[in-house]
Amino acid sequence: FVNQHLCGSHLVEALYLVCGNDGFFYRPKAGIVDQCCTGVCSLYQLQNYCN
């Protein structure tokens, strides 16, 4: 997994892939869009959103 820009459905698909059956949660104040869409996201950053 390479750091990359993830926006919209690509971001959701990446979260499903990383989190698996645990699912994930959305924290508006955490800025996942700023982190992953405007900037680039690492696998570690995505895992922070898993349940």
Curated annotation (Swiss-Prot):
Keywords: Carbohydrate metabolism, Disulfide bond, Glucose metabolism, Hormone, Secreted. PROSITE patterns: INSULIN. Gene3D superfamilies: Insulin-like. Pfam families: Insulin. GO terms for molecular function: hormone activity. One of its GO terms (biological process) is cellular response to oxygen-containing compound. It comes from the Eukaryota. One of its GO terms (cellular component) is extracellular space. It is found in: Secreted. CDD domains: IlGF_insulin_like. SUPFAM superfamilies: Insulin-like. Disulfide bonds join 7-37, 19-50, 36-41. InterPro entries: Insulin, Insulin-like, Insulin-like_sf, Insulin_CS, Insulin_family. Its main location: secreted. Heterodimer of a B chain and an A chain linked by two disulfide bonds. Insulin decreases blood glucose concentration. It increases cell permeability to monosaccharides, amino acids and fatty acids. It accelerates glycolysis, the pentose phosphate cycle, and glycogen synthesis in liver. Belongs to the insulin family. This is Insulin. The gene is INS.
